[in-house]
């Protein structure tokens, strides 16, 4: 069982087979699979606890409805792992509160019908035969809260959401990798063989393998080893409403594909987000500021295809609204970077474009299979060098 070790509870080990930088969900999953593969693995995290940056502001959703074939396959594998998570981490009865109430994508544009058909055809071809293409009448019959403006919908009952911190701690407890908090990486040392050591404010760890799982800060950490990663970060905000009264508790995650706005029930509350098209890429941020104009804007956009949100907006009180913000980290084709860098022994697991929760299980399994040689480098679709060589993957259309 992995432990979380703060500076007052113990010193850093002097060596490890693998050092993972970052203890968000991607770092925790990377360490879990590495330790399960028999590699002596430790995680270093500069904050006081695991999961305090992007993971802490996650919408906690999981889905296998994507447009890019490699993403579809990865997210399908992840969701399968999450459905049997207690068995995966070997913690009998461990509960991540997986709610499979589905994902419903909607459009009011009749001309988007062929695009929806194309995406569903691709998903069916890759084995997701349960994904449904719904005409307007069927959408309204099954989801009566949807406006008559809707033209077509896509639905997958298997998608849903979970408790991300339970998932994070499940990976930590189920693995054999300790997490050293308040540990800042200041250098990655190299020799003629590649990675040699990780230098931190708490000491130096000798290692021949380093995994960068630092979310928005991944490019900055890679630069310590002289590696350029073309990572971009943009702000994304979410609103949680403590009281709403009219949001159907059995509703799926609903996505307005025209605007990018989404919402879902959240126990007795609700969560809304998306639709931010104008934010420009920025440097990675420890604290991402919020905009108090955002709740009104997102509620207005949500009401476009789900009119009940207009009544919620009319009588909402300030103390019922909670805003948080994080950063989506992505590269040009909106697909993750998983695998080795030009420096031998230096690996990266990042750029999930705000969807690290759902990508972390399968993406981290792939990463460790690349480290151990179970998967050949040439069989990895998410390699960093695809970006430099211009061999980008088909751009992922379904980022929200």
Role assignments for model-derived ranges:
Residues 155-208:
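Helical element adjacent to the flavin cofactor pocket in flavoenzyme catalytic cores
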Residues 51, 204-250:
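Central helical "cap/lid" subdomain
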Residues 16-42:
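N-terminal Rossmann-like FAD-binding beta1-loop-alpha1 element of flavoenzymes
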Residues 36-55:
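Glycine-rich FAD pyrophosphate-binding loop
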Residues 304-400:
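C-terminal catalytic lobe of FAD-dependent flavoproteins
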